[in-house]
Amino acid sequence: MRTGAYTVHQTLTPEAASVLKQSLTLARRRGHSQVTPLHVASTLLTSSRSNLFRRACLKSNPFTALGRQMAHPSLHCRALELCFNVSLNRLPTNPNPLFQTQPSLSNALVAALKRAQAHQRRGCVEQQQSQQNQPFLAVKVELEQLVVSILDDPSVSRVMREAGLSSVSVKSNIEDDSSVVSPVFYGSSSSVGVFSSPCSPSSSENNQGGGTLSPNPSKIWHAHLTNHHSFEQNPFFHFPKGKTFTPDQAFPVREDANPVIEVLLGKKNNKKRNTVIVGDSVSLTEGVVAKLMGRIERGEVPDDLKQTHFIKFQFSQVGLNFMKKEDIEGQVRELKRKIDSFTSWGGKGVIVCLGDLDWAVWGGGNSASSSNYSAADHLVEEIGRLVYDYSNTGAKVWLLGTASYQTYMRCQMKQPPLDVHWALQAVSIPSGGLSLTLHASSSEMASQVMEMKPFRVKEEEEGAREEEEEDKLNFCGECAFNYEKEAKAFISAQHKILPPWLQPHGDNNNINQKDELSGLRKKWNRFCQALHHKKPSMTAWRAEQSSSVLPGSLMDSSLKQNSRASSSVAKFRRQNSCTIEFSFGSNRQEGLKKTDELSLDGFKSNNDEGVKTKITLALGHSPFPSDSENSEEEEPEKAIKMSKLLEKLHENIPWQKDVLPSIVEAMEESVKRSKRKDAWMLVSGNDVTAKRRLAITLTTSLFGSHENMLKINLRTSKASEACEELKNALKKKEEVVILIERVDLADAQFMNILVDRFEAGDLDGFQGKKSQIIFLLTREDDECVENEHFVIPMVLNCNKSGSGLVNNKRKPEYDAAPTMIKKKNPRIEEDDDESNVACDISNIKKEFSRQLKFESNALDLNLRVDADEDEEEEAKPATEISSGFEERFLDSIQNRFDFTVLSDEDITKFFVTKIKDSCEEILGQREERFGFTVDAELIEKFYKGCGFFANGLFEEWVKEVFQRGLVTVKNGGKEGISVINLCLGGIDMIDQGEVYEEEEGFMGTCLPNRIHVSFVD
C-alpha cells in the first residue's frame, strides 16, 4: 500500500501533493492508522494555501443559490468543518499516537487518487489527439481533479449531506472555475504547451479564429495568481532552467513584512522591538528582509519607520575565530559612529542588519589572542551593551537578524538567552511546503530531501539530482577539516601559478573553480562514508565556514544552496504541532556493512534502484545518532528534547538548579560531538538523592521507561555480581542508563570493564551491536541510611490540648529549616563502628592485592593498619581508590559535576510546600486556628527515600494517600485542634532502632499506603 502511495504521489502536482502531506499530518496527529478521503476533504476545507474547495462550497450554499444574501456565509463552511471533525472523531485511534507507526493510505483514498489520475490522463489524451504534433508525456494530477475525485467518495458525500450541501453542486462549481483555463503540468518537457482540462470548453469555443489556443491573460491572472497557484504549473511563466522567479516580479507581496514592522513599532511587545526572523531556509528569511528594505525605501511604512537607514553589521564564524579583542571593539566603535551620524539628523532611525545569527551560538573560543577568549561572546556582550545604551536614550535603533530554527533554539539556550540579552522578538516564517520524508526501507540509507519551493521551476533529471545530493557537505568534522585544508591549498596554488596580470578573470574562472571544489566535496563525501561508516557530522562544521576558502560568488552559488537544502529535515517545534517531511528521488548510497573491511569498492557509488520505499516518521527515537537511521538528526528536534530534559530535571531536583544546565549541555555535546555512542558523567558530592533522581530522569526522558536503567551500588554489591550485571547490560541492552554508585570502591575486574568500554567506545561494535548507553558514575556519596528501602511509617498527630508539639526530641517546624543527615541513633552508630572495623581490615587486604596487581613494583606504605586510630576522625570509605590507574581513568572523564548539599533549606521547602498545599486544599487555610508542622526526621526520610521515583509519583502519593488521612482528620472533627503534626509513626519503635515493615509501599516505593491518624487531647 505504501509503495502504491509513493507511486501515486509522483503523479501529483506540488499543490496537490501539499494537500496530501497535510492530510498525512492530520491523520498522524489524530492517531489514525490510515489516511482516508475524510482527512483530505477536511484539509482542503481548512487549508490556507488553497481556497478552491471552500469557495466552491460557498457558491453551493442554498441561500446564495436562491439569490438571498446570507449574514455570515462562512458559517456554513464552519458547520461543514464541524461535521468533518465529528466524522474524524468516529474513526478508530491509537491509544498512544506519539509512538505509533506512520499512517498508510486507505483503499478508498488510493481509489480516489487513481480516479483523479485517470480523469486527468483522459483529458490529456483528448487534447493530444487534437494536437498531433505534441508527444505523449507523463501527466501530473492537478488539485481540481483531486478535489472532484474526493467528492465522489461516499463517506465525503454523506458528510456533505449532513451539513446541508450537495457534493454534485460543489463539483459543478469546481469544474466551472477550472474551465476558465486549467493548464496541465507535465513531468518532463523542455517545451511546455497549454492544454485545457477535460471539463474545459473546446478549442473552437475559446478561439474561433484559429487552431491554436490563446486564453485570456486577465483570466489566467485571476484564476491562478489569486488562488496561490505555483508558477511552475503555469506554462505562460516558463523560465530557463536554474533561474528563480520571485513573487515580487509578478505582484507585490507585502504580508510577510507586516509582522516585522509590527515588532519594530512595539505593537506585539513594547519592551522587545528588535527582530529575529526565523525560517527553514536562508532564501525565506533573506526574502523577508529584502521586502522590508523595499517597503522602507518606497515609504510604504508607518511614519515612525520612514527615513530609516540600514547598516550591515554581519560576521561569519571563521572570521570571528581570527579576530582579536581590539578588532571587535574597533568594529563596535565604527558601528556606533555610523548610528550616531544617522540619528543626529532629524530623528532618523537606523536598523542594524546582523545577518545570520549562527556566529553568536555556534562560534567557538578559538581566538588569536588568548585560548580563553571568545570573540563571538565578546561581540554578543558589546551588542547587548549597545542595545541597552540606545534604549535608554530613546533613539530609533533596531536590530534585525535572521536565524534557522536550530540556531534560534541555541539562542534561547544561551546564558543569558540571546532574545533576552538583545530584546529580540522572533518572527516565524512558514516554509513553502510541509516536511514529509520518504525513507527507503534499507536500514543504512538516508533519504534525499526535495524542498517544495513554490516559485522555482524544477526540471532536473534524476542524474542531476543525484549529483546535487552528492555535492552537499555531509561528511564528519575530521573529513571536513581535511576538505577545507585541501580546498585552501587548491585556491592558493591557482593564484601562485601565474602572475596577477596573467590570471584568468570572469565567470569562466569561477565556473572552473566551482567544478574543482565540487569534485573535492564528492571525493571527501565518498571517502567519509566508506572510512568512517557514516559518522554523524560535527555541528561545529557548517557551510558558512567555507567563506574563507571560496570566493564570494562561489559561496553564493554552491555552499548557500547546500545550507538551504540541508535544513529541510523532520522537525517538531513549539509553533508547529506536527511537521513531517516528504522526500523524492533516487536512493542514496548504502554504507558499508562492516567497518573493518575497507576496500576500493567503498569509493564507488552504490545505487540500488529496486529498493522498496516507504513513508517513515522519526518520532519517539533516542536523541543519539544511530546507524539504522539518518545520523544527521535535525538540531531543533534535539534542542527540544534537551529543553524538555532540563524541565524534568528542574522539576525533580530543584535544589541543584545551578548544576542542571551544565548537565544538559554536556549531554547535548556528547550526543553531537562525541565519536563514541556512549555518554560518560562523573558526579561527586554527598547528595545521593539528586544523583539517583538524575539517573531516573535521564532514563525516562531519553529512553522512555524505568526498565532501561541499571543501578549498581558498589558499597553493598558483591564484586562478582556487579561485574556480571555490568557485562549483561552491555551485551543485552541497546538503550540503558547505568548508574554506578561509589565507583571509587570498584575492584580491579570491574574497573577493567569500565576502562575497556571507555577506550573502545563500543565494546560490542565488532559484533554489529548498536547500543546507546549513558554511564553515570558517582563517588564521595554520603553514608547510606539503614533500612532506606523499607516503607516509612507515618502518623498524623492532631493535638487538641494546645500544648504544642508531641515530642520535644524532634524539631517538627518546617519553618525552622531542620538539619538533615545529622542525627544518628546511638545503637545504629555502635553497630556501624563495629562493622567499619571489620570492613576496614578486609578492605585493606583488597587494596593491598589490587596494588600488587596494577603496580607490582610500587607499594603504598601509607595504608591504614590500625583502624582504631581514626575513630575520632570523620568516617571515610575504607577502599577508596589510591591507585593512579583508576584515578587517571576518572580524571579522563570530561563531564564532571558536583552534587553537594550545603544547606537543606531548599530540600525542606521542596517537600513541605507540596504537603502544606495539600493540607490547605482539604482543611482550608485556618492557620489562625491551628498550625501544621512536619517532623524534621520525616523530611530526612523523604529526602533519602525518594531517590528512585520521580516527583510526579510523590505528588500522586500526596493526593491519594496523604489527603485521605486529612479527610479522616476533617471527618473526625477539626474543632479544637491546635496543632497537626506529620511525623514518623511509633516513637518507641524509632528510638529502639526497630524496623517497621509493610508488605509493599505505595506503587513499590518507600511511601506508605496509609497514614495513621491520632487525636491527642
Curated annotation (Swiss-Prot):
It comes from Arabidopsis thaliana (Mouse-ear cress). It is an enzyme of class 3 (hydrolase). A motif (EAR) lies at residues 859-863. Probable component of a transcriptional corepressor complex involved in salt tolerance through modulation of reactive oxygen species levels, abscisic acid-dependent stomatal closure, photosynthesis and K(+) /Na(+) homeostasis. Has an in vitro ATPase activity. This is Protein SMAX1-LIKE 4. The gene is SMXL4. GO terms for molecular function: hydrolase activity. Residues 105-183 are annotated as: Repeat 2. Pfam families: Clp_N (PF02861), NBD_SMAX1 (PF23569). The lineage of its organism: Eukaryota, Viridiplantae, Streptophyta, Embryophyta, Tracheophyta. Interacts probably with TPL/TPR in an EAR-motif dependent manner. The keyword Magnesium does not apply. Belongs to the ClpA/ClpB family. Its EC number is 3.6.3.-. Residues 196-217 are annotated as: Disordered. GO terms for cellular component: nucleus. Residues 12-91 are annotated as: Repeat 1. Induction: Up-regulated by salt and abscisic acid treatment. Disruption phenotype: Reduced drought tolerance and hypersensitivity to salt stress, resulting in poor growth in normal soil. One of its GO terms (biological process) is response to salt stress. Detected in seedlings and roots. Expressed specifically in vascular tissues. Expressed in flowers, stems, siliques, leaves and roots, with the highest expression in open flowers and the lowest in leaves. It is found in: Nucleus.
